[in-house]
Structures are given as C-alpha cells and as structure tokens.
C-alpha cells in the first residue's frame, strides 16, 4: 500500500481544509495517508492577535520523516507569489535528505491558497515543485486530466500545476465545495499514480 504524507501550512484554515480533502481523496485512491503540518514561525501572541487558526489538530512534521513516504502532497499558503516562509523554512531543513538522495523517485504534488485570484498561485505551485525536483521527486500535477477545471461556469481555483483556492485578503472566502472536490481528485490521482510507480 502506498504511504502518503499530506504536509501543509495554513494560517487561517483554508489550506487545512484543502489538505484534509486531498487526504480523503488519497485514501479513496487506496493510500495510507498521514496528515501533518509544518511549525508556525509567527510568535503565538502575534498569531492570536492576527486571528490565526492556532487550534489545528494535525501534528507537527519533522523534515527527516519525509523519507518514510512514497508520495508527498504539499499544501501551502502563499506570500507574494511564493510559498509561505513557514513551508520554505521546513523544506530548507531537508538538505541532509537531499545529500543522501532520500527523496529520489518519491512522488510529489502541490496545492496553494492565495489571498486574491491573481495572487501568484501558479508561480507558487511551480516554485514549490522546484524544491521537489531538486530532490529528484516525480511531479504529479492536477493537470487537465481533471476536466472539470476546463469550465467557466463558476469561479474556482485550480491550474494544470495543482489545486488552488482563494481566501480573500481578510480570509472570509472559504474553499468551495467544488474546490474541495478538486483537492480530493488531486489526492486520489497522486495515490493512484504512486501505486503504479511503487506498487
């Protein structure tokens, strides 16, 4: 059975929802899934004053454990068209894994959340994939295998590179039912392709 990690960073809970949906989809695809988050770097008093969702139940991951999984889906909030610094800080600690080649041929996929529709989602998806490619990981994007993203009948996130959602600047917009379904599809797709590669 495929072992998958869904690893995320979420300040306000948007990516937490997307990560949970991706994990559900991966389980539907036959994977054994672990859901974890990266450590918060913002001081607790600042996070509380900024109304961060600090009661997230997912345990904190450690960089060394990434090698334990066949596939890793990363979900991250974005900052100025890049992954959030919390995720970048976590990934920057994987140099030892890189030196050992511990993630070579593991499967990787990415999802992001932005404040605005044009907040750099595609750039954040691709730049996060770069991190995975430096490790020799095999990227499985959402892609146009997910035909639902071809429609223009409703505003929704998504790109061929990975699933996205928009939170609005104040965090008031929550992931839509369609976006959560899209994340489930991405999780299921990654699980099924990983099973073919590592089964």
Swiss-Prot record:
- Listed binding positions for substrate are 98
* Enzyme class, broadest EC rank: oxidoreductase
Give the reactions, separated by semicolons, that this protein catalyses.
a quinone + NADH + H(+) = a quinol + NAD(+); a quinone + NADPH + H(+) = a quinol + NADP(+)
Chain positions covered by the region annotation Disordered: 158-181
Q: In which domain of life is the source organism classified?
A: Bacteria
> One Gene Ontology cellular component annotation?
membrane
Q: What is its EC number?
A: 1.6.5.2
Flavodoxin-like domain residues are 4-190
Binding residue positions for NAD(+): 12
Give GO MF terms, alphabetically: flavin adenine dinucleotide binding; FMN binding; NAD binding; NADH:ubiquinone reductase (non-electrogenic) activity; NADP binding; NADPH dehydrogenase (quinone) activity
Feature: compositional bias, Polar residues: 163-177
Q: HAMAP family attached here? A: NQOR
- Its recorded name reads NAD(P)H dehydrogenase (quinone)
User: Taxonomically, what lineage is the organism?
Assistant: Bacteria, Pseudomonadati, Pseudomonadota, Alphaproteobacteria, Hyphomicrobiales
